Amino acid sequence: MSRNKRLSTVYLSANDVIEVVNRVGLSACIAGVAERIERDFLRWQEFDKSARVACHSPEGVIELMPIADANEFSFKYVNGHPKNTHDGLPTVMAFGVLADVDTGTPRLLSELTLTTAIRTAAMSAVAARALARPNAR
């Protein structure tokens, strides 16, 4: 049987991500990411988790963070270079790839710097809900 799948990779630039956040709203984006994080925690055992790989230098760190489930493989590349501000660059920059496990076909290549900040806020919300006393407001 022939598996004729079309090769189609979506690319999201930093401007594309900003446009989505502006259109949907920052609060809605954080809430949506928090919801997805909570759903993924419920299926934690389904993930093939690998330790992040880090490359340290005197100027900063570059990390590669891979993860997969039965259908998708993903990684995030993120750096932390505190002195970048001297050159007008962000101290943290990130991008990532989402690929089909069966074929290795990249489905998404995305700039993730803003998404990383949103995920950090969403994770804080998830943790606050999990640790809050019952009936807390």
Q: Each predicted region: which residue ranges?
A:
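N-terminal ligand-binding/catalytic initiation module
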Residues: M1-R119, M123-A125
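Glycine-rich adenosine-cofactor-binding loop
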Residues: A121-R137
